[in-house]
Amino acid sequence: MKNKILDLRAYFIAGPQDFPKLSIDDAIDKISVIIKSGVTVYQFRDKGTIYKNKNQRLEVAKRLQEVAQKAAVSFIVNDDVELARELSADGIHVGQDDDSVSKIRELIGQEMWVGLSVSNDMELESAQKSGADYLGIGPIYPTNSKSDAAEPIGVDHLRKMLEHNQLPTVGIGGITENSLTELSKIGLGGVAVISLLTESENYKNMVQKIKQNIR
């Protein structure tokens, strides 16, 4: 909610589909451990997850929201306005193909944060006046975490985009431990990651490395 400070530094995105070899319950346990490892934002993104019914999805989201709340981690819902409203989430994140930010504002009011994905200069320019609270720019590097990802923009182009940007921003897409250093020097408010954490052998150490580089 907007009465809290939105700390974007270590922005974790995941759903049960990001642990394909695990049951939904075991995936929730893994995600919960990562949420409690020091991340600052958790985005519930469950595209590709097969649930028994709508109620099971709601229960999964509620369980993860409760973990985030207890850990003082901001809880963001990906795309789904209805779910964000039902949970009274801290915010919602949408893409260019979803409803406009102004339309979403009509549905959720002013209390939730709205994040918007941006992948090129034209979208960035439009986003400045969209009413979004923060942006996710990328993909920066090639990524396997999203099958519908746009072409990578690269660090140099991202740096130029940030020169024309007035909104808090996370970089996203293909971020590895080795790329954190170069991303620390271009003015990002945070990095949004999936596999960097889901595939990590030590979640707390990886989150600490993110925070050491993105300040």
From Swiss-Prot:
Cofactor needs: Mg(2+)
Binding site for 4-amino-2-methyl-5-(diphosphooxymethyl)pyrimidine: 43-47, 78, 117, 146
Enzyme category, top tier: transferase
Binding sites annotated in the UniProt record for Mg(2+): 79, 98
EC number: 2.5.1.3
Keyword match Transferase: yes
Catalytic reaction annotation: 2-[(2R,5Z)-2-carboxy-4-methylthiazol-5(2H)-ylidene]ethyl phosphate + 4-amino-2-methyl-5-(diphosphooxymethyl)pyrimidine + 2 H(+) = thiamine phosphate + CO2 + diphosphate; 2-(2-carboxy-4-methylthiazol-5-yl)ethyl phosphate + 4-amino-2-methyl-5-(diphosphooxymethyl)pyrimidine + 2 H(+) = thiamine phosphate + CO2 + diphosphate; 4-methyl-5-(2-phosphooxyethyl)-thiazole + 4-amino-2-methyl-5-(diphosphooxymethyl)pyrimidine + H(+) = thiamine phosphate + diphosphate
GO MF annotations, alphabetized: magnesium ion binding; thiamine-phosphate diphosphorylase activity
CDD domains (alphabetical): TMP_TenI
Co-factor: note: Binds 1 Mg(2+) ion per subunit.
InterPro entries, alphabetized: Aldolase_TIM, ThiamineP_synth_sf, ThiamineP_synth_TenI, TMP_synthase
Binding site for 2-[(2R,5Z)-2-carboxy-4-methylthiazol-5(2H)-ylidene]ethyl phosphate: 143-145, 174, 194-195
Metabolic or biological pathway: Cofactor biosynthesis; thiamine diphosphate biosynthesis; thiamine phosphate from 4-amino-2-methyl-5-diphosphomethylpyrimidine and 4-methyl-5-(2-phosphoethyl)-thiazole: step 1/1
One GO term describing the cellular component: cytoplasm
UniProt-listed GO biological process terms: thiamine biosynthetic process; thiamine diphosphate biosynthetic process
HAMAP family listed in its UniProt record: TMP_synthase (MF_00097)
PANTHER family xrefs: THIAMINE-PHOSPHATE PYROPHOSPHORYLASE, THIAMINE-PHOSPHATE SYNTHASE
Function: Condenses 4-methyl-5-(beta-hydroxyethyl)thiazole monophosphate (THZ-P) and 2-methyl-4-amino-5-hydroxymethyl pyrimidine pyrophosphate (HMP-PP) to form thiamine monophosphate (TMP).
Family according to the record: Belongs to the thiamine-phosphate synthase family.
Protein name, as recorded: Thiamine-phosphate synthase
Annotated organism of origin: Lactococcus lactis subsp. lactis (strain IL1403)
Gene name in the database record: thiE
